[in-house]
């Protein structure tokens, strides 16, 4: 598959946004406080964020995909388990942030970290032989590998190989099958939005006799027989593949079933897929994050509803040891991932991509549709005295055609009307994808 730069980076951008939308949606209803029944009885049919965050805190499901991929910054060639292990040691503060420090023999990641620190090399650090089968097959095998799928588009086998190597630092057995499955699905989503084809590509990268393949196929078979009742499928998972059958804090197999269920019953719709993954309970932010990446790539930017995308505002917070890396601008990171995608294919990086990755520099070009780069604007002027409409105009350079307009009431407190469509557009200076929008500001509402 030839990579057209703008099309490729927009898919990356959509996938990474999708991952973070899923994480943000699922995080407030994680276990152990939130059971399936409590989520159902409290929120019913979820169709939007259940918690309105002004600032969403760092989450391990975003930390891992960002920091473990930084092995590519320090090691040339195909990623190896030991290269990723060094990223673990280089970017984590022991006991603080990045992932769950739950204790040796309890938290898979904490156990692997201490193994590495004490001189146990990867992949032995995450092996069943070293840590036991239960610990090695927890959900972390698949929740930290989304970016490996994003940098290997339309090549599921290679994406799965990279993901297995990365996940083997801390996981083994079914944990590695989960890594391969999710990364392969993400990679396949660059060339098709067909959910069956995407899941087939994931299954092709894991042993047919594996428990992971069995739970995915069980869900698909149930869906074929009961295509309209995802809650019945969730009941089947509880009865036949539930937490009572698998040890540890958060085993990968029940959650693999949720990911498969959400993709089947979401039927290619981004929002419905992450919503179902969240309503299924168990590891809600992990599962919604994984399927959010897959569906984000498959559906593209146009498939991400504004009420989910806007609150992300192109910015996430991380919790690694390097403070300057902990505020991540998503559009800039998408260009960085695209650069790695070309490099890993052994192809020259197009100037359209390399020119937008500015090492050691803050650079916002707003070339990706709807990008905000984390910026917030608010009018602070008082209403126009004696004006029939109290109208103000704000003019600025905006990315794409999806805009936010702001107004200030008499009290001077900004009110935002996000996802408004600007009244008029005209092409701005290069690049041609920039548009100039004029937003009419009213004291009572924002009219665009």
Feature annotation, model-predicted:
Residues 1-448:
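Structured, active/binding-site neighborhoods that engage oxygen-rich ligands
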